[in-house]
């Protein structure tokens, strides 16, 4: 049977490892428990988390047990990694609700039945910690000098780093130790921005338990220009269909740049590598076949085959002019009374764009169309003349479509 390490390596997930040869040997001969942490700062996972979910799924398919840790405790502090400002603190109720939402989304590609995967909340052990005992047992193993060299703290030192956030690395290291003791968890995985925190946990277990522990980071999902993928004009690309519709989700992947198709097929689908190579070799107009496959496969994983098929049909209807299938396109319904209002007001009210200012910005940039006509007037008012048989068609940029139907 193929070693999952080789699968992860071939598909390009792996960025850094603590002990490469040991990890490869371990994954090939034993079934291990490993964990990935999720920071519950929102009530939905987004595309940035999707790559982590894929790694968990590949590992589970090879017989290893994923532990999904939600940071109900650390979430009350906030991870300073990659942040320029201190995060707003959330209530316990918010965090608990977000954790429940995460499990539902993770369960779409991770099997939680019969102890094949487990979800834990670090609030269970962090919230009742005795501070003096924690300092004596854990704090003694952390060098402040060494911590200050970590990338996650460097960028914050000039602007100000609170002692609250400085504790985050100790908390995350303690999470790994706790999971090692309770579940024999021997490996922590995470995005490459978590490397310093992962090293801290590996080192803590080796010091406290005199046992082997390992860490692995994987590449972040970036485009060919090095920018993080998953951002749209409306904000983040969420996995919750209420926040990002299956159609919008499908369209995002259908419209990725040609240069990003191969990477996306490798990292966020389960297509065999031979098929990935075949699709990635297509050129010219044929690359659209690869993009359609990518969009369908990714949407199917997150929203199910039925929703993926609906999104595909709606996208093809739009370009093929088949009006009867437009019902699968993101559609907002308004009353007749809502007409004769400024377009920017309606776009914000229908949540097609996050705000009026965003709508104005898009109009100024020449990126907004009504019924395929470019909008040049920021004060444009929609009237009955704009209502067609299919509703009012709104296009953002070249390929993002919405429909407004007047009831």
From Swiss-Prot:
Q: List where in the cell it is found.
A: Cytoplasm
Q: Does the keyword ATP-binding apply?
A: yes
GO MF terms, alphabetically ordered = ATP binding; RNA binding; tyrosine-tRNA ligase activity
Q: Which UniProt keywords apply?
A: Aminoacyl-tRNA synthetase, ATP-binding, Cytoplasm, Ligase, Nucleotide-binding, Protein biosynthesis, RNA-binding
* BP-aspect Gene Ontology terms: tyrosyl-tRNA aminoacylation
- One Pfam family assigned to this protein is SYY_C-terminal
Q: What is this protein's function per UniProt?
A: Catalyzes the attachment of tyrosine to tRNA(Tyr) in a two-step reaction: tyrosine is first activated by ATP to form Tyr-AMP and then transferred to the acceptor end of tRNA(Tyr).
Under what name is this protein listed?
A: Tyrosine--tRNA ligase
Recorded source organism is Clostridium botulinum (strain 657 / Type Ba4)
- Gene transcribed to yield this protein: tyrS
């Amino acid at each position: 049977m193929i070693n999952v390490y080789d699968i992860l390596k071939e598909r390009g997930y792996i960025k850094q490892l603590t002990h490469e040869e040991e990890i490869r040997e371990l994954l090939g001969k034993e079934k291990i428990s490993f964990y990935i942490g999720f920071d519950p700062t929102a009530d939905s996972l987004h595309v940035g988390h999707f790559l982590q979910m894929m790694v968990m799924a590949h590992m589970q398919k090879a017989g290893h047990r994923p532990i999904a840790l939600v940071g109900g405790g650390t979430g009350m502090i906030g991870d300073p990694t990659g942040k320029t400002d201190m995060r707003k603190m959330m209530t316990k109720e918010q965090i608990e609700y977000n954790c429940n939402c995460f499990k539902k989304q993770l369960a779409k590609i991770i099997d939680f039945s019969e102890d094949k995967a487990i979800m834990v909340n670090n609030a269970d052990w962090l919230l009742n910690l005795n501070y003096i005992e924690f300092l004596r047992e854990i704090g003694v193993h952390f060098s402040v000098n060494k911590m200050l060299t970590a990338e996650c703290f460097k960028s914050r030192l000039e602007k100000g780093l609170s002692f609250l956030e400085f504790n985050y690395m100790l908390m995350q290291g303690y999470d790994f130790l706790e999971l090692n003791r309770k579940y024999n968890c021997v490996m922590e995985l995470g995005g490459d921005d978590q490397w310093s925190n992962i090293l801290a946990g590996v080192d803590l277990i080796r010091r406290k338990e005199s046992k082997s522990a390992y860490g692995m980071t994987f590449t972040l999902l970036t485009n060919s220009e090095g920018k993080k993928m998953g951002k749209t004009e409306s904000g983040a690309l969420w996995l919750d269909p209420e926040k990002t519709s299956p159609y919008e989700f499908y369209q995002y992947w259908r419209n990725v740049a040609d240069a990003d198709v191969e990477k996306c097929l490798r990292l966020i689908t389960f297509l065999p590598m031979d098929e990935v190579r075949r699709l990635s070799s297509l050129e010219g107009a044929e690359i659209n076949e690869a993009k359609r496959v990518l969009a369908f496969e990714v949407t199917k994983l997150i929203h199910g085959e039925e929703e993926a098929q609906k999104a595909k049909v709606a996208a093809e209807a739009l370009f093929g002019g088949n009006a009867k299938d437009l019902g699968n396109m993101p559609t907002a319904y308004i009353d007749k009374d809502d007409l004769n209002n400024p377009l920017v007001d309606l776009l914000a009210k229908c949540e097609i764009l996050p705000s009026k200012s965003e709508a104005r910005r898009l109009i100024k940039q020449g990126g907004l169309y009504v019924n395929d006509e470019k909008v040049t007037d920021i004060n444009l008012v929609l009237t009955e003349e704009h209502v067609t048989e299919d509703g009012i068609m709104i296009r953002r940029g070249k390929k993002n479509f919405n429909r407004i139907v007047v009831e």
